[in-house]
From Swiss-Prot:
The keyword DNA damage is assigned to this record: yes
Subcellular location: Cytoplasm
Family: Belongs to the UvrB family.
Function, in words: The UvrABC repair system catalyzes the recognition and processing of DNA lesions. A damage recognition complex composed of 2 UvrA and 2 UvrB subunits scans DNA for abnormalities. Upon binding of the UvrA(2)B(2) complex to a putative damaged site, the DNA wraps around one UvrB monomer. DNA wrap is dependent on ATP binding by UvrB and probably causes local melting of the DNA helix, facilitating insertion of UvrB beta-hairpin between the DNA strands. Then UvrB probes one DNA strand for the presence of a lesion.
Species this protein is from: Clostridium botulinum (strain Loch Maree / Type A3)
Protein name: UvrABC system protein B
Domain of life: Bacteria
Name of the gene encoding the protein in the UniProt record: uvrB
Keywords assigned: ATP-binding, Cytoplasm, DNA damage, DNA excision, DNA repair, Excision nuclease, Helicase, Hydrolase, Nucleotide-binding, SOS response
Matching Pfam families: Helicase_C (PF00271), ResIII (PF04851), UVR (PF02151), UvrB (PF12344), UvrB_inter (PF17757)
Length: 662
């Protein structure tokens, strides 16, 4: 077995050795929950890599979005070039979930565009877990969605060895059963082709290499791996495992049992609908389900087969789905990166899925078994965990309460100090801001400005542009690729000031930023909480000349705690620098061109069409306000501050409209 081995020109320094030793010791002692508190720029990923090397456990690293997962995966691949580092995120470029809107009698069919490259990477991740122990998978929270039964996946794997007696047609039959398609013309991922005694298979986990099986009678004579483009042999193999082309592949025997159970559930549900005088719904359900059954009998699967996953797995009603977590061996290790954001996401997922399924089941579009094709509930997620390390600069109450051990990583190897925080009065804040911006630009650096409202951000951007300052506004409507391009342009100096509400997302640790300003810092609330203030201050922690200006007439508790914590960290770093003769240096980071990655289509709710929203709530303005307040709190908890601020503005408008009516 390959051992995890970190390859790096750097050795752990500062707080890293202590944190690595402390967390690794906790894992070896069998502690279930631990927390690594690491400030921005302290090398948390390097610490994680060294912990993995020390404990030698297959590892899952959970990130709160696809882009951050890609960044982490890239870093881990640099640290572990000789081990399997895989990437597992949602494979949808675009995803419109199946839904039914009863008010308008509108059925919205599931519509999705699958990214073939990401699907390949998902197959590569699951197959790696069955082939070796030295595996790190970096995943987004989509890994808590149902994935198909790992036991069935393993059982359906075709194992071929040189010299094995095996009938060619029998292998072809098995390939079809695990959802490979024969295609002698367009040879692509998940297909096979046959020419005489030669069988070529293009594995689902590969994009450029395929396998050639050469027969001599009923015996496998040779197995080769070859380049699909050139046809050249890469290597000769003694053994090859061909994993299913779909995670939902099912054996014929199990499929027959599942179909019988689906038919029984259909009969029962149709009777129930008829007894409620829902004749149309009963007829619709019968027609749709029978069509799916016919497809399963003919080709082994159907569109939306995941809705029958509970029946296909043979699971009891209400039991948790099988997910990526079930593909890992029992002794796996989980790192939850940016846990203060990732955990609330995990908690929220199942509730949203259920509300969408309610109308599909009620109106005869799906059988009740569709409820069990869902993400894990938070309790189920907890039950599947073995050992967990929460990683965050600002861990939440949950992480700190559950952790038996907490390691702190305050010292940065670069010697960089947390920025100095200056508090200035609100009166004249815009004029003072303009002066500070001009001084920073003269020194060749960039500026981040955070505001409380969307309108203020827009007005400030317009004002600064009028004053001749090259400024851009980063708002929630900008997709991931455009966001990355804006950050790239800021670093290159195409513009100097970036204004926004939520500057806490990935990709904003920019070394060129030497000034972060927080307008209306004394307005206590979700946008100016201790967590968000500490995170915002951290945006300036990559530059040796950086500072933070908070504009506020009073010092709130959140401001006080942030200033106290920042000063504590500065003192620790200064003492370390003095002791070791370290001179703080700004991080040197290459400005890479924007990588064209396809991003998951995030469902966005439109909150601006209030008339339509009120209609759907029978013009009950109080109920709509209550709903939006819940969504605002949830968005704030997830650090989605632009969304929360927009919802807050919508709530104000609704309340004003209500007062006007009275």
């Amino acid at each position: 077995m390959n051992q995890f081995k970190v390859i790096s020109k750097f050795n752990p320094t500062g707080d890293q050795p202590k944190a690595i030793k402390s967390i690794a010791k906790g894992i070896e002692k069998g502690e279930k929950f631990q927390t690594l508190i690491g400030v921005t720029g302290s090398g948390k990923t390097f610490t994680m890599a060294n912990i993995i090397e020390k404990v030698q456990k297959p590892t899952l690293v959970l990130a709160h979005n696809k882009t951050l997962a890609a960044q982490l995966c890239s870093e881990f691949r640099e640290f572990f070039p000789n081990n399997a580092v895989e990437y597992f995120v949602s494979y949808y470029d675009y995803y419109q979930p199946e839904a039914y809107v009863a008010q308008s009698d509108t059925y919205i069919e599931k519509d999705a565009s699958i990214n073939d490259e990401i699907d390949k990477l998902r197959h590569s991740a699951t197959s790696a877990l069955f082939e070796r122990k030295d595996v790190i998978i970096v995943a987004s929270v989509s890994c808590i969605y149902g994935l198909g039964n790992p036991e069935e996946y393993k059982k359906l794997t075709i194992s071929l060895r040189e010299g094995m007696e095996k009938d060619r047609d029998e292998i072809i039959k098995k390939l079809v059963e695990i959802q490979y398609e024969r295609n002698d013309i367009d040879f692509s991922r998940g297909t096979f082709r046959v020419k005489g005694d030669v069988l070529d298979i293009f594995p689902a986990s590969s994009s450029s290499k395929a396998v050639r099986i050469e027969f001599f009678g009923d015996e496998i004579d040779r197995i080769k791996e070859f380049d699909v483009l050139t046809g050249e042999t890469i290597t000769k193999l003694k053994h090859i495992s061909i994993f299913p082309a779909s995670h939902f592949a099912t054996s014929k025997d199990r499929l027959e049992i599942a179909i019988k159970n689906i038919e029984e559930e259909l009969e029962e549900r149709v009777k129930e609908l008829v007894s409620q005088d829902k004749i149309l719904e009963a007829q619709r359900l019968k027609q749709r389900t029978n069509f799916d059954i016919e497809m399963m009998r003919e080709v082994g699967y159907c569109t939306g087969i995941e809705n029958y996953s509970r029946v296909l797995d043979g699971r009891a009603k209400g039991t948790p789905p099988q997910t990526l977590l079930d593909y890992f061996p029992q002794d796996f290790l989980l790192f939850i990166d940016e846990s203060h954001v990732t955990l609330p996401q995990v908690k929220a997922m199942q509730a949203g899925d259920k509300s969408r399924k309610d109308s599909l089941v009620e109106y005869g579009f799906r059988l009740p078994c569709a409820y069990d094709n869902r993400p894990l509930t938070f309790k189920e997620f907890e039950n599947k965990l073995n050992q967990v390390v929460f990683v965050s600069a600002t861990p939440a109450k949950y992480e700190l309460e559950y952790s038996a051990n907490t390691a702190e990583q305050v010292i940065r190897p670069t010697g960089l100090l947390d920025p100095e925080i200056i508090v200035k009065p609100v009166k004249g804040q815009i004029d003072d801001l303009y002066t500070s911006i001009q001084e920073t630009i003269k020194r060749g650096f960039r500026i981040l400005v955070t505001t409380l409202t969307k309108k203020m951000a827009e007005d400030l951007t317009d004002y600064l542009k009028e004053m001749g300052v090259k400024t851009r506004y980063l708002h929630s409507d900008i997709d991931t690729i455009e966001r990355m391009k804006i950050i790239h342009d800021l670093r290159k100096g195409e513009f100097h000031v970036l204004v926004g509400i939520n500057l806490l997302r990935e990709g904003l640790d920019i070394p060129e930023v030497a000034l972060v300003t927080i307008l209306d810092a004394d307005k206590e609330g979700f946008l100016r909480s201790e967590t968000s203030l500490i995170q915002t201050v951290g945006r300036a922690a990559r530059n040796s000349e950086s500072k933070v200006i908070m504009y506020g007439d009073v010092i709130t508790k959140s401001m006080e705690k942030t200033i106290r914590e920042t000063n504590r960290r500065r003192k620790i770093q200064m003492e370390h620098n003095e002791k070791h003769g370290i001179v703080p240096k700004t991080i040197i980071k290459d400005i890479r061109e924007v990588i064209q990655i396809s991003d998951i289509a995030e469902e966005r709710k439109e909150y601006d069409n209030l008339n339509e929203a009120l209609k759907s709530y029978n013009n009950d303005i109080d109920k709509l306000i209550e709903k939006y307040e819940e969504e605002m709190k949830e968005a704030a908890q997830n650090l989605q501050f632009e969304k929360a601020a927009h919802l807050r503005d919508v709530i104000y408008k609704l309340k004003r409209d209500k007062e006007t009516e009275l």
